[in-house]
Amino acid sequence: MKPSLSILSTVTGGALLFAAGITSVNAADNWSFPVEVWKPAFDMASPRSKMDYTPLAKASKPWNICVSFPHMKDAYWSAVNYGVADEAKRLGVKMQLVEAGGYTNLNKQISQIEDCVAGGAKAVVIGAISFAGLNNMVKEVRAKGIPVIDVINGMSSKELSAKSLVSFGEMGFKAGEYVARMHPAGSKPVKVAWFPGPPGAGWVEAGNAGFQKAVKGSAIQVAETKYGDTGKEVQLKLIEDTLQAHPDVKYIIGTAVTAEAAVGLLRARGLSDQIKIMSYYFTPGVFRGIKRGRIMAAPTDSTVIQGRVAIDQAVRILEGKDYQKHVGPKLYMIDGKNVGSFDRNSALAPDGFKPTFTVN
């Protein structure tokens, strides 16, 4: 049960292999995808190498895997849900998904995971509500010999078995860099309202730091930074409050829920031509918004792939096979120029996908 690079082969040819990777995700029996590998693991500042991730063909037995999400309130987590559920089916393992109902429900997430473990889970995949708040629980679960995989959001625990996630600092940076290039230093100052997400979540703190770093030294002025849960009502209220306090903002940039809520609000107020919208991650709503010209751009972190990899990591560890300890899909910006050629299978759940809480 040791981490290894043997399951990966070096990727060359960037965009070509990205397209090939997406195509192979559709295959019924197997898939592969361009990823980045951090080594030493669990440090986002570690050097990265580009690889092509190939999962197991099948599990040796129907392992019972528990998956815990912060919530299932938006299409971002639906995509991760599709990734973990479909990969569990492909590998032939059991999967039980629990969701805590929102980023304010840390204690509920902890108790749900504890119940999963008490119910016989052999591995746990966690999309964490808090960067540090689950560390004691992770330590307790690991002490029982149960692997814990950190997916999407990030945790600071050193006891983790593996990570399947990207740098949200880089996601925030890419969004900030995109707009900063349009308004370089020396040009007319432009006000931006920034909505990074729920306070205290690891991905939010990283995303905020990356965004602020990217716009520093440009003509971008961050007029307001508003934190809040990624429920639509919460984000809509934050946008309304910000527009009242700063009617001269030219960009609304933030979570996918922020961007989707802003589209309707700006249209209703006749402000669509005056204020541009960006998200710093990717959902079906953002995808549609970019296609229709209502959202300017967003980086994609290939959410479905992160879910698939997490399940594959769990099975590899349970079976004592070589596994990759810290891996995440390569990031790409999607805008009006390439949205038409973008294959959604790596980032979005299929049309008509319903939340899947159990795979037997």
Show where each model-derived region lies.
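Hinge/cleft segment of the Venus flytrap/periplasmic-binding protein
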Residues: 28-63, 195, 199, 215, ...
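Flexible loop/hinge segments that line or gate small-molecule binding clefts
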Residues: 29, 131-170, 181, 191, ...
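Hydrophobic alpha-helical segments within soluble ligand-binding/sensing domains
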Residues: 48, 52, 109, 164-190, ...
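Hydrophobic alpha-helical
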Residues: 123-143, 211, 228-289
